[in-house]
Curated annotation (Swiss-Prot):
The gene is trpA. Tetramer of two alpha and two beta chains. Keywords: Amino-acid biosynthesis, Aromatic amino acid biosynthesis, Lyase, Tryptophan biosynthesis. GO terms for molecular function: tryptophan synthase activity. HAMAP family: Trp_synth_alpha. Signal peptide: none annotated. Pathway: Amino-acid biosynthesis; L-tryptophan biosynthesis; L-tryptophan from chorismate: step 5/5. Belongs to the TrpA family. InterPro entries: Aldolase_TIM (IPR013785), RibuloseP-bd_barrel (IPR011060), Trp_synthase_alpha_AS (IPR018204), Trp_synthase_suA (IPR002028). GO terms for cellular component: cytosol. This is Tryptophan synthase alpha chain. It comes from the Bacteria. Its EC number is 4.2.1.20.
Length: 263
């Protein structure tokens, strides 16, 4: 059992939905992003997704691409991202952390080395957007052997033939991308997403979390209500990018979390 599994079990017992928040590590600098990260649990965040900045983020929309660029320009590296996690874990042993990004930085570091460092730092799961199930032997299976959850994305184009393959070695939760395309695009509508979430839930016992396009507490409530929770990324990253004070960012996160928890 990972911290992710424990969190969903607790939320189920409380009759609550999960609120997942995404931030980019090192955006706009290490100090600010760590301050935001430290404040997320108190703001109501159940699971933290920590973006690993990468030079070619093909699945990300402009908001998150720009955040990654700012982080890289500020000197953020995979080593510093792991240091961030260690600093957070020195104060918080409960909140699950999922690292999200691309395979290249992990491959460059060496899978075995990365997994040893990630587990030691206190990472609970990985989302690697450019590794399909056909390449599970590369990272997914070694990650699970190391005790990490490997979380997979399903999309509106994941048809019934493809879905079992996507779910095959997935653990922790399934991340349903409610809009086809890049992150932070048009808003998702609960009525459109509900049948797709039901289709995925019929094929797995794992929790299903809906993401992409959620910007308001009302949308968080609507979308969390048809799934096991929701994730907000671009709306939070946008505030950081605008240079808003950490307290203001966290107030906004708290409002979004309250929306999800009201579902």
């Amino acid at each position: 059992m990972t911290r992710i599994d424990d969190t969903f079990r607790r939320l189920r017992a409380e009759g609550k939905k999960a609120f997942v928040a995404y931030i980019m590590a090192g955006d706009p600098d290490l100090e600010t992003s760590l301050a935001v990260m430290r404040g997320l649990p108190e703001a109501g965040v159940d699971i933290i997704e920590l973006g690993m900045p990468f030079t070619d983020p093909m699945a990300d929309g402009p908001t998150i691409q720009t955040a990654g660029q700012r982080a890289l320009e500020g000197g953020q590296t995979l080593t510093r991202t792991l240091e961030m996690v260690r600093a957070f874990r020195a104060e918080n042993a409960e909140t699950p952390i999922v690292m999200m990004g691309y395979y290249n930085p992990i491959y460059a570091r060496g899978v075995e080395t990365f997994l040893a460092e990630a587990t030691e730092a206190g990472i609970d799961g990985l989302i690697v957007v450019d590794l399909p199930p056909e390449e599970d032997a590369e990272l997914c299976l070694p990650a699970q052997a190391a005790g990490l959850n490997f979380i997979r994305l399903a999309t509106p184009t994941t048809d019934s033939r493809r879905l079992p393959k996507v779910l095959q070695n997935t653990s922790g939760f399934v991340y349903y991308v409610s809009i086809t395309g890049i992150t932070g695009a048009a808003a998702a509508q609960a009525a459109d997403v509900a049948p797709e979430v039901a289709r995925i839930k019929a094929a797995t016992d794992l929790p299903v979390i809906v993401g992409f396009g959620i910007t308001t507490p009302e949308a968080a409530q609507d979308l969390a209500g048809i799934a096991d929770g929701c994730v907000v990324g671009s709306a939070i990253v946008k505030l950081v990018g605008e240079g808003r004070p950490v307290a203001e960012v966290l107030d906004r996160v708290a409002a979004l979390a309250a929306g999800a928890h009201a579902a």
